[in-house]
Amino acid sequence: MNTQILVFIACVLIEAKGDKICLGHHAVANGTKVNTLTERGIEVVNATETVETANIGKICTQGKRPTDLGQCGLLGTLIGPPQCDQFLEFESNLIIERREGNDVCYPGKFTNEESLRQILRGSGGVDKESMGFTYSGIRTNGTTSACRRSGSSFYAEMKWLLSNSDNAAFPQMTKSYRNPRNKPALIVWGIHHSGSTTEQTRLYGSGNKLITVGSSKYQQSFTPSPGARPQVNGQSGRIDFHWLLLDPNDTVTFTFNGAFIAPNRASFFRGESLGVQSDVPLDSNCGGDCFHSGGTIVSSLPFQNINSRTVGKCPRYVKQPSLLLATGMRNVPENPKTRGLFGAIAGFIENGWEGLIDGWYGFRHQNAQGEGTAADYKSTQSAIDQITGKLNRLIDKTNQQFELIDNEFNEIEQQIGNVINWTRDSMTEVWSYNAELLVAMENQHTIDLADSEMNKLYERVRKQLRENAEEDGTGCFEIFHKCDDQCMESIRNNTYDHTQYRAKSLQNRIQIDPVKLSSGYKDIILWFSFGASCFLLLAIAMGLVFICIKNGNMRCTICI
C-alpha cells in the first residue's frame, strides 16, 4: 500500500484591530527656532518677536499738545531773544527742539546748561510773573545790534542796566524778590563781560565790579572779566547766564554795582512734558509715546533696536536685532514613518500631530465606529493661562519712562559728558545681556511647562484606564474592552469609570501575551520564529518520510 503524505505549510499574519486611544501634541511643518538657557536653536510651534525694529520717521502728535520751537532754542524761552518772542509763555506736553534753534542773540552761554535743559523739557511749558524791580539813577534800556527786531533791541525778559551816561559811576544797588507761589520759581540773570576795560568803564563807570546773589540755599559772587575775544554776531563781549530754583516763600537778593543783566520776570513750570531734539516733520495723524531724533517708536514690545537715545515710554534699547520669545511648545514635525495604526504617533514627546490645530494637546482614537481626533482643552488652557501675559511681564520689567541726556556739552561739561556716554554704553551692554537672559529664561520655562502638561495629561489617562488598558510605548493605550465614541469621550473628559469594564477587560487580557516589544524587536522575533518553525516542520516531515521508507510504507523511485 502506497501511502502519500502531502505536507502544506502556510504562514499567515493577521493584524487584529482593537480599540485604542492615543495622546499627542500639536506640531507644524516648519517651526521657529528660539534659544533657552541650556540650548540654542530649539524649534517651537509658536514664537513672538520681542525686539522692535520698525520706526515711524515723523514725530507723532495725535492726542498731544506739541510745541515746535523752530528757530528758538529751549533756553531762549526764559530770556527772550527775538527768535523766541512767540514762546515766552507756552503750555505743552511735547516740546520739539530743532537743530536750527538758538538760545541767544548776544553771544554767551548758560551755566549748567544741560541740567537746565532737562528741567525745561519736563516742565510742561512756562508762565511768568513780574519780579517788580524798579530802578532810578541808571538806564534800563541797553540794546545791541546782535538782537534785532525792527532795530537794535535786547532780550525780552532781561534788562541791560547801564550808567546814567557814558563813563558815569554806577551806584550800588540791592533788589529782592520773594516767590509768592506754592511751586518753585526759576530765576535767570546775566553777567556782562565787556570786550575791553575801556568798554566796561564806558558802560558802568570805573572801578571793580561785583555782583552778589543769595537766597536761603544759594550764595554766589561774580566778577566780570573784560577782555578781547573773537567777534560773534558783531560782538566781542559775552553774557554768562546763571540760574537758580527759588523755593516757595523764599527770597533771592541781588547786590550789584554794574555789569549786571537783571531779570524782568520769574518763570514757573506748568506741568509735565517730554522734550525731543529732532528735525523730522510732525504728524497729527499718528500717535505714540516714545520719541527719538529720527521719529516715533510705536510698539508694545519690551525691546527696540532703533535708537539708544529715546524719550518717553519706550522699549529698552538692546543691541540684538531679534530676540524670539517662545509662546508655544517644542515642535517636532510629524514623521509618517513613525506612525502606528491610523497615524498614531510613536512617542508622544518625540513626535507631533500637524493636524491638531485647535489645541496644544489632544487625542486620537480607533474603535468599531471609526477613527477620530479631538483637542484636550483643559491641558491646553492650563498651558496657555501660564504663558499668556509672558510678553506683558517682560514689558513690565523693562518699560520705564526716562530721558537720556544728549551730548551737547560745553567744554567745562565735557568730562561729565564722557562719563555719561560711557555709562550709557555700559547700560546698553548690560541691558542687551539682561534681555537675552530674560527671554532665554522664559523660553526654558515655556518648553518645560509644555512637556510637563503633556505628561500630566498622559498620567491622567493612565490612572483612569488602570488595568483596563495597556501602554504600548508610543503614547497609545490598547483598550481590553469595546470602547465606543461615548466611552472614548469619557476618557477624554476624565469621567471614565474603570470598574464598569473591569470584568470584560480581565477576560480579554488573559488571552493576550503580556510581553510587549518595540516594533523593531517584533520584526526580528517574527522572522526568527518563522524560520525556526519552518525548519522544525521540515525536520518532522523528513523524519516521517524516513520512517515510512524504512517500514516499507513508502517507496521512493528515482528516475534518470
From Swiss-Prot:
GO cellular component term of the entry, any: host cell plasma membrane
- One Gene Ontology term from the biological process aspect of the record: fusion of virus membrane with host endosome membrane
Question: What does the PTM comment of the record read?
Answer: Palmitoylated.
Q: What is the effect of changing residue 504 to E?
A: In strain: SC35M mouse-adapted
Spell out which residues lie on the membrane's Cytoplasmic side: 545-560
**Topological relation to the membrane, as annotated:** Single-pass type I membrane protein
Leader sequence segment: 1-18
Q: Which residues cross the membrane?
A: 524-544
Q: Where is the lipid attached (S-palmitoyl cysteine)?
A: 556, 559
Question: What positions does the record give for glycosylation?
Answer: 30, 46, 141, 249, 421, 493
Provide the coiled-coil residue spans: none
Q: Annotated Gene Ontology MF terms?
A: host cell surface receptor binding
User: Which residues are marked as site: Cleavage?
Assistant: 339-340
Cystine links in this protein are: 22-476, 60-286, 72-84, 105-147, 290-314, 483-487
Q: Which UniProt keywords apply?
A: Clathrin- and caveolin-independent endocytosis of virus by host, Clathrin-mediated endocytosis of virus by host, Disulfide bond, Fusion of virus membrane with host endosomal membrane, Fusion of virus membrane with host membrane, Glycoprotein, Hemagglutinin, Host cell membrane, Host membrane, Host-virus interaction, Lipoprotein, Membrane, Palmitate, Signal, Transmembrane, Transmembrane helix, Viral attachment to host cell, Viral envelope protein, Viral penetration into host cytoplasm, Virion, Virus endocytosis by host, Virus entry into host cell
Extracellular membrane side: 19-523
Q: Pfam families of this UniProt entry?
A: Hemagglutinin
Q: Where in the cell is it found?
A: Virion membrane; Host apical cell membrane
What is the protein's known function? Binds to sialic acid-containing receptors on the cell surface, bringing about the attachment of the virus particle to the cell. This attachment induces virion internalization either through clathrin-dependent endocytosis or through clathrin- and caveolin-independent pathway. Plays a major role in the determination of host range restriction and virulence. Class I viral fusion protein. Responsible for penetration of the virus into the cell cytoplasm by mediating the fusion of the membrane of the endocytosed virus particle with the endosomal membrane.
Instruction: Summarize subunit and interaction data from the UniProt record for this chain.
Output: Homotrimer of disulfide-linked HA1-HA2.
Additional record remark: Major glycoprotein, comprises over 80% of the envelope proteins present in virus particle. The extent of infection into host organism is determined by HA. Influenza viruses bud from the apical surface of polarized epithelial cells (e.g. bronchial epithelial cells) into lumen of lungs and are therefore usually pneumotropic. The reason is that HA is cleaved by tryptase clara which is restricted to lungs. However, HAs of H5 and H7 pantropic avian viruses subtypes can be cleaved by furin and subtilisin-type enzymes, allowing the virus to grow in other organs than lungs.
Q: Which family does it belong to?
A: Belongs to the influenza viruses hemagglutinin family.
Q: What is this protein called?
A: Hemagglutinin
Recorded source organism is: Influenza A virus (strain A/Seal/Massachusetts/1/1980 H7N7)
Q: What is this organism's lineage?
A: Viruses, Riboviria, Orthornavirae, Negarnaviricota, Polyploviricotina
